[in-house]
Regions:
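Gly/Pro/Ser/Thr-rich low-complexity, intrinsically disordered segments predominantly at protein N-termini
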Residues: 1-194
Length: 194
């Protein structure tokens, strides 16, 4: 059944799959975290500036790699063990993601872990959502996960080591160095340039 209004869904008790997600025809952007519905808040102007700056900086670097950068909205399906196709319960839309394995890309987005995920914090992001995404990306095998805080102008880099994230010290007014792309360096001044 096609859903045309988000109020037709049960955000508290509902457990949804990608097959159901594909039938939703309402304006609000949402994500599914292990089947649970999370409404995405509209990005702030600072969020949009950071996303645009990163798209430029990373785009210049990535175009010389065998990878591709994808900005939101772009569905990333993260199947849990045993989940396949439209039965997947986790669909996220990272602000930016980099995928080097082109076989993960299909006509609907990415299936499986991107190599790099970047989330830009907006006032509407809940701590619960951030904690769940950290765990989801870790479990899915996202090799590097950046969390960017525009209001305080710092970046946190999480690197997957032995299936667990190692969180590096917050980066303020300095270069952000990627571990998985050793020659990628972006200064926070370029990230937060307005």
């Amino acid at each position: 059944m096609t859903i045309t209004n988000i109020n037709q869904l049960d955000p508290i008790n509902g457990l949804y799959t990608y097959a159901e997600y594909l039938l939703w025809k309402f304006e609000e952007r949402v994500e599914l975290l292990k089947g649970k519905l999370f409404k995405m808040s509209a990005p702030s102007p600072a969020h949009q500036v950071v996303q645009s700056n990163l798209n430029i900086e990373l785009g210049l670097y990535i175009r010389n790699q065998k990878c591709q950068i994808y900005p939101a909205p772009f569905d990333v399906r993260l199947p849990a063990k045993g989940e396949i196709g439209d039965a997947i319960h986790t669909v996220v839309q990272p602000d930016l993601c980099v995928v080097c394995d082109r076989t993960k890309i299909d006509s609907r987005g990415c299936i499986g872990a991107p190599d790099l995920v970047i989330e830009i914090i907006s006032p509407g992001n809940s701590k619960k959502e951030l904690k769940q995404k950290f765990k989801l990306y870790e479990e899915a095998g996202v090799r590097e996960y950046w969390v960017i805080h525009p209001s305080e102008e710092y970046v946190i880099v999480n690197v997957l080591e032995n299936n667990h994230y190692k969180t590096l010290s917050p980066i303020v007014d300095d270069e952000v160095h990627s571990v998985i792309f050793p020659t990628l360096k972006v200064h926070t001044k370029e990230i937060f340039r307005n």
